[in-house]
Amino acid sequence: MLKKEYLKNPYLVLFAMIILAYVFSVLCRFYWIWWASEFNEYFFNNQLMIISNDGYAFAEGARDMIAGFHQPNDLSYYGSSLSTLTYWLYKITPFSFESIILYMSTFLSSLVVIPIILLANEYKRPLMGFVAALLASVANSYYNRTMSGYYDTDMLVIVLPMFILFFMVRMILKKDFFSLIALPLFIGIYLWWYPSSYTLNVALIGLFLIYTLIFHRKEKIFYIAVILSSLTLSNIAWFYQSAIIVILFALFALEQKRLNFMIIGILGSATLIFLILSGGVDPILYQLKFYIFRNDESANLTQGFMYFNVNQTIQEVENVDFSEFMRRISGSEIVFLFSLFGFVWLLRKHKSMIMALPILVLGFLALKGGLRFTIYSVPVMALGFGFLLSEFKAILVKKYSQLTSNVCIVFATILTLAPVFIHIYNYKAPTVFSQNEASLLNQLKNIANREDYVVTWWDYGYPVRYYSDVKTLVDGGKHLGKDNFFPSFALSKDEQAAANMARLSVEYTEKSFYAPQNDILKSDILQAMMKDYNQSNVDLFLASLSKPDFKIDTPKTRDIYLYMPARMSLIFSTVASFSFINLDTGVLDKPFTFSTAYPLDVKNGEIYLSNGVVLSDDFRSFKIGDNVVSVNSIVEINSIKQGEYKITPIDDKAQFYIFYLKDSAIPYAQFILMDKTMFNSAYVQMFFLGNYDKNLFDLVINSRDAKVFKLKI
């Protein structure tokens, strides 16, 4: 009897659904923990390392907050939202720092089930919410960006807008004071957590205003909700925002009759004018330029040089095909189609769900802006599928028993989740760095000072700063080609040029932090160098850096290290592109070749490589299509650490070299095809061959995974 009473209590049923969905989401994310724990190379400091490159930026910020300080201009994320939350969790919980950053996403991202279930409950459809929560919490795109070890702001980047959507729908349906104050609260939290959400928040508030004008134009509480929400978009300090919002909320709650539509109109107009004057549209324009129109601001800033745009090389902002798009959102194409149909049906039944359109549309921008956006559509489409399944059950109940209907729904849910389970099983993401790489960088921390710089590619900027506690020129947050030009140049040009550019770029970068806002150092460091060295032709200036008699007039203020990891060989052609571009035209008109490969097959005296090259078994030539190309030399590398290699000359007039790596830390880089330009690059000569000028560099860390050189000039 007591059991039946519990089952009849809607709040207990709702609570049980939330707990079950949350536990389900967490357990699914623990699969990666179980799998990764089998590999010792994924551990550092007795804990699994994280799998998110950007996560190291927030980890560095949290580490510095725990220490209580950081170096000026070190690009630390000190005080950022995720770093701050991590700091407080470290202070109030008994867990280690490494454990906190590993598991935060596991537990926080699973909170998405709460607003989904609560939202469906507003429509008196608990089954819709429960099924949607199960699907949304582990759908491919959402799982990939919130799995265990994915330490990033993505862990709440969908949770918070779903709470905003829930309170908007609740406001429409109930018109209650709780929703009125909760709505701006969650918008404010979302903006603090993820400042790039500004555009989405504007879209949500704008649509809410339009909805109000169409369906509730005579109800004052909706206009007050728009005003309070809009105030969170302002650039004033949060405590001023909070004070104004609380005062206006209290005035409305206590003096509704005196706040007539004229006063509300004046308040609304004043709020709008204030937002425009405070630069409220600037964040929207930036997001559109970078992700949709793919513009690189560096060309505008420099008014001269046209650099390579880094967002063209990031997988997250590449366009995706429609099948992949559907799978990422709903786990499979068929579930996506059912979800889309269900969402349209849901809109027809409950017009307030139109408030979900900005979130859904942002996810659909993945077709143009890249796969990273698909995560936004996941919960909205899941609600559509949940609604469809709840309607299907209603039809079944009319024809069959309750038991039969429940069995059918359970079976359909399992079938829906099956592709997602397969994806979770197959998606075995490695940690950002291996244990050896992390240990090497931790060793560098004991060699370098906090004010010293490490010159390396931007992919490694955040981890290098976290493990070595140094400064870097670039990192995952620098998306302008003008920043990445310098490390690209230092790694892909000859040693002399690399040494000179490393010193110049670091010293000029430091000077730029203290330059006036209108100084050329703020807009383009390369142009500032040319100005100081009385050079007007960029090609001549860059060529002069290769000359031994080039004199650096800039005073040396700190030590500089070059970090050259083995893994960079997989992307070195991309790395080099940033400095081989024609700075006058923005066109990559200086062709070069650097291509890693592994053997696929051997037949008829030929070795078929993974990059499409067919290599003769005597290594004297290779074929690309029908073209046969001679090889200059074969370089057999027996030990990268010891610098043991053998060069076999073949044709001194040929332009290409074949590297055969017998000692490789990268499993998919057994062969490297490169031309003379790349062969003479600092990365190839110093890392693979161990050839470096002792007057320019000292080798301070040496392994087959990575080498670190200290600049002596």
UniProtKB/Swiss-Prot annotation:
Regions of this protein lying in the Periplasmic compartment: 36-96, 145-152, 193-197, 234-237, 279-324, 370-373, 428-713
Chain location of the short sequence motif DXD motif 2 per the record: 152-154
InterPro entries: Oligo_trans_STT3, STT3-PglB_core, STT3_N, STT3_PglB_C
Known cofactor(s): Mg(2+); Mn(2+)
Sites where a glycan is attached: 534
GO biological process: protein N-linked glycosylation
One Pfam match: STT3
Catalysis: reaction(s): tritrans,heptacis-undecaprenyl diphosphooligosaccharide + [protein]-L-asparagine = tritrans,heptacis-undecaprenyl diphosphate + a glycoprotein with the oligosaccharide chain attached by N-beta-D-glycosyl linkage to protein L-asparagine
Primary location group: membrane
Motif extent (TIXE motif): 313-316
Membrane disposition: Multi-pass membrane protein
Pathway(s) served: Protein modification; protein glycosylation
Enzyme Commission number, as recorded: 2.4.99.19
GO cellular component, one term: plasma membrane
Region: Interacts with target acceptor peptide in protein substrate, residue numbers: 457-459
Site annotation Interacts with target acceptor peptide in protein substrate: residues: 54, 316, 328, 571
The keyword Repeat appears for this protein: no
Motif (DXD motif 1) on chain: 52-54
Domain notes: Despite low primary sequence conservation between eukaryotic catalytic subunits and bacterial and archaeal single subunit OSTs (ssOST), structural comparison revealed several common motifs at spatially equivalent positions, like the DXD motif 1 on the external loop 1 and the DXD motif 2 on the external loop 2 involved in binding of the metal ion cofactor and the carboxamide group of the acceptor asparagine, the conserved Glu residue of the TIXE/SVSE motif on the external loop 5 involved in catalysis, as well as the WWDYG and the DK/MI motifs in the globular domain that define the binding pocket for the +2 Ser/Thr of the acceptor sequon.
Family: Belongs to the STT3 family.
Protein name per its UniProtKB record: Undecaprenyl-diphosphooligosaccharide--protein glycotransferase
Organism whose genome encodes this protein: Campylobacter jejuni (strain RM1221)
